[in-house]
Amino acid sequence: MTQTSNSQYLVILYYQYAPIKDPQTFRDQHFKYCESIGLLGRIIVAQEGINGTLSGPEEQIHKYMDQLKQDPRFCNTVFKMETVEAHVFPRLSIKVKPELVNLSLQENVDLTKDKGAYLAPQEFLQALQEKDTLILDARNDYEYDLGHFRNAVNPNIRHFRDLPNWVKQNTHLLKDKKIVTYCTGGVRCEKFSTFLKKEGFDDVYQLEGGIISYGKHPETQGALWDGQMYVFDQRIAVPVNQKEHVIVGKDYFDGTPCERYINCSNPQCNKQILCHEYNEHKYLGACSDKCSNHPQNRYLKKHNNPNS
């Protein structure tokens, strides 16, 4: 389909826990529709619901949202929306998975039962300033390293599925505490806060709408957030705090303030590191000597053959 060059583009993030009896058929129909209206992005479909982020021209994004909400299961879906200059995804990917977000529990938590109470952005800001409240980041380590709420606890996990083990190893930190957890858009906290309640922690809360909603709220304006927010698209980093910008990221090599992520130039490693441009050139885009000397080093291929 054709688009006018002056179309405003939008990127949306959303999720909805709702039963999907035949995820594969749902996925196939969903892919066909998204492709037909020119949307790009990533969507996960599971028996427990849908979790997605898409980009496209404003008209097509609104068309998609209206179409999804016509399904009674998704009529209450909340979409977080931002304006962008163009597509922020290279392709459209819709996959069927066992869970929307993978906690790898032997028995999946029941999201229709007890879960962490929602805190609106204003309430979350108040919780951030409470002395005895534990603010727990439910995201991965590389997300935390780029930006996080001030004084938030960092579980230092590589994958969301590592959180349950971290909780079991750190019950002494959580016991008898008011626990407030947060993530990018809220989908991880829905499941994680339910897990915490199931584990016997009673005073559990979650940031409603995630970091994205908090940063855009007119009263909070992202206050007490330091750094930038990691996003899973071509932007990589987006601002949250509208009042001040405190850089917390540190260059992988020299520890200087940095908010620029690259992937290690060894395709078999691909580790994400915060790295200034001068250090990328110095270390051939790699995270180690071993990776810099790898025969498939992408940095060397690119600079030895600029047309490749």
Curated annotation (Swiss-Prot):
Source species: Onion yellows phytoplasma (strain OY-M)
Organism superkingdom: Bacteria
Active-site residues from the entry: 183
Protein name (Swiss-Prot/TrEMBL): tRNA uridine(34) hydroxylase
GO biological process, one term: tRNA modification
EC nos: 1.14.-.-
Primary role: Catalyzes oxygen-dependent 5-hydroxyuridine (ho5U) modification at position 34 in tRNAs.
MF terms (GO), sorted A to Z: oxidoreductase activity, acting on paired donors, with incorporation or reduction of molecular oxygen
Protein family (similarity comment): Belongs to the TrhO family.
Domain Rhodanese per the UniProt entry, residue ranges: 129-223
SUPFAM superfamilies in the record: Rhodanese/Cell cycle control phosphatase
Enzyme class per UniProt: oxidoreductase
Catalytic activity: uridine(34) in tRNA + AH2 + O2 = 5-hydroxyuridine(34) in tRNA + A + H2O
HAMAP family: TrhO
Keywords: Oxidoreductase, tRNA processing
Record Pfam families: Rhodanese, Rhodanese_C, UPF0176_N
InterPro entries attached to this UniProt entry: Rhodanese-like_dom, Rhodanese-like_dom_sf, Rhodanese_C, TrhO, TRHO_N
